[in-house]
Amino acid sequence: MLGISQISNRWLAIIGLVTLPLVGLSVAYEFWYAFLVPPALLVVWMTLYRLDWAMWFIVFATPISINLTDLTGGAGLSLPTEPMLVLVTFIALIKMALLGEFDQRIIKHPISIAIYVYLTWMLFTAITSQLPLVSLKQLATRIWFIVPYYFVLAHLFLKSDRNKLTFLWLFLITLTVAAIYTLVIHSQYGFTKKTSTWVMFPLFKEHTSYGAVLAMMYPAALYLTFRKSSWGFNAVAGAMLAILTLATVLSYTRAAWLSLVGAGAVYLVYL
């Protein structure tokens, strides 16, 4: 009986043997889209055998993902995260329903039960909807966002406290990249309030969602900056905090500013 590591190594070898000729043929016939096949197969392999790696990649890529609706006006699809979310959801549901690999504390948690009720109600209303296909698509979208971001991450967080720090670092690093991109574009227009509504495009649709994400992750950057750690990690976290501070101010999102003031007030109450 082969172990998981042996099976995964065998599949990696098969992927390599299949993709090498494809790359050669794509060069010979100048069919450049074939170069997308190797990373696509690697993503499938990673999702099947290392669900944690796949989830960390999704977390890392989320702040810099691009929505095709914004660029083409077609079907809404965020790349590269959304196809992976679908794969992770499929594997996670199999592990939850058939293999029982998820912590029962997550499955039976009151928030989880509330989610089950919410999705069941969505299914009922989708069936009775005037446009059932549209409603079912909306339900499917909800499922492939909720399962990875709630159930899979909760499983990883319960598995190890280090995973919580991994999540914060991965998300904040690319959020800082997105903030730098926005600041550079914004600087070309003199940091005016009028242009602040769209300079974060295509990473964020407009400044409201951009400011909301900055405000939500600002306390995390603050925590990483002042937690007991090596000076190198604290210095990097401090640099990210400075960039996110500037980005939050120049987002001209009053709701984000007020939420940070409110969060600070709550912190002082419990200090």
Question: What do the predicted segments below correspond to?
Answer:
Residues 29-33, 75-84, 138-142, 202-216, ...:
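Membrane-interface micro-motifs in multi-pass membrane enzymes
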Residues 1-23, 39-43, 89, 116-127, ...:
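Alpha-helical transmembrane segments of multi-pass inner-membrane proteins
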Residues 7-95, 124-128:
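N-terminal signal-anchor transmembrane segment
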Residues 59-61, 106-116, 168-172:
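Cytoplasmic-side transmembrane-helix entry/capping segments in multi-pass membrane proteins
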Residues 27, 74, 128-137, 249-251:
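Membrane-interface helix caps and helix-loop-helix hairpins in membrane proteins
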Residues 47, 51-53, 94-114, 224-239, ...:
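Membrane-interface helix-loop-helix junctions at transmembrane boundaries of multi-pass membrane enzymes
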Residues 70-71, 130-135, 190-201:
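Membrane-interface helix termini and inter-helical loops of multi-pass transporters
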Residues 81-87, 110-121, 132-156, 175, ...:
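Aromatic-anchored transmembrane helix interface
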